[in-house]
Amino acid sequence: MSDAPSSSPDATASHWCYHCNKRVVVETLDDFVVCCECNKGFVESIQPTPAAYSSPAPPQPLSPDLNVEDSSIGSHFLQMLRLLAHAPSQRSPPRHLDVLSYEDDFFRLELNSRNEIDDDEDEDEDDGDEEEEDEEENLTVNDEEDEEDDLRRRNRFPLTTTQSRTGRNRILDWAEILMGIEDNSIEFRMESDRYAGNPADYIDDAAGYEALLQNLAEGDGGGGGGRRGAPPAAKSAIEALETFEVSSSEGEMVMVCAVCKDGMVMGETGKKLPCGHCYHGDCIVPWLGTRNSCPVCRFQLETDDAEYEEERKKRTSTVSDSAAASSSSSTSRY
């Protein structure tokens, strides 16, 4: 075997090594480019970076439509967005990578490896059986390395393509954001104490929360100004309820108290409302102490609330008048 030819290292890191995953200096060995660090041939020449990506563009002056001073928060915010939009990506692989470049590199590696194999066969065709076995082992190793290089190249191609597209999309997104900010008049101001809507709808401190909880409790508790529904029945109306004793005839009807859902047995006493429904005395009296209506038919007893009684009379008179009018109209038709 002859000595390896002299190498001519490239002074600048103009290639990307996919084995080292960084920019490297390469050596040229008979038109075969290898990495100086890992001595692998899985390298790619980096195209010259376009001027658009070479250096970040200087911040442009703010649009006069914003009417914001240079020392304001809006000015610094827009400048920061512009710097982020033009910031170059760090340690990114070559940008101009396509399918043809990968295929060309693959064929170049394949041809170089095959040429080396042919040269080895020509030089070693007079050697013994041991050298032939070594040559077969070398061929197997080279084929395995070629397959590994091919697999790595195919796995890295979607990743590098996605990274390059993501970088371009990121710049376009920032450009759209900046254009939208400059096209629309946006006022940058510090947080103020002004409210949107009615200031009474806001709760600023613990006292406000306590007042809110108190109002909710009063609304659900049924006492004070938060009472809902009809008022309790008058004490005179409760005392005037008819008391009866369950007889044999009534026991056969299987009377059931609608409050406790228990049957009333023969010989037991109960209370009867004017509507005719019967209950246990211990059940209906507490019920009427909170509301004046019958649990079954909603018949209303008198109350001690004068305002409620006045409204009930008005409703009753209105219903009676409408019923009389409807009956008279139906009679006139016939």
From Swiss-Prot:
Compartments (UniProt record): Cytoplasm
UniProt KW Glycoprotein keyword: no
Pathway in which this enzyme or protein is active: Protein modification; protein ubiquitination
Keywords: Cytoplasm, Metal-binding, Transferase, Ubl conjugation pathway, Zinc, Zinc-finger
Source organism, top-level taxon: Eukaryota
UniProt entry tagged with the keyword Zinc-finger: yes
Biological-process GO terms, alphabetical: protein ubiquitination
Disordered as annotated region, ranges: 111-158, 307-334
Acidic residues biased stretches: 117-149
EC number: 2.3.2.27
Catalytic activity: S-ubiquitinyl-[E2 ubiquitin-conjugating enzyme]-L-cysteine + [acceptor protein]-L-lysine = [E2 ubiquitin-conjugating enzyme]-L-cysteine + N(6)-ubiquitinyl-[acceptor protein]-L-lysine
Gene3D superfamilies assigned: Zinc/RING finger domain, C3HC4 (zinc finger)
Broadest EC class assigned to this enzyme: transferase
Stored PANTHER family: E3 UBIQUITIN-PROTEIN LIGASE PRAJA, OS06G0633500 PROTEIN
Quaternary structure (record): Interacts with the RING finger of COP1. Interacts with UBC8 through its N-terminal region.
Entry's free-text remark on domains: The RING-type zinc finger domain is required but not sufficient for ubiquitin ligase activity. It mediates the interaction with the RING finger of COP1.
Name this polypeptide is given: E3 ubiquitin-protein ligase CIP8
Gene: CIP8
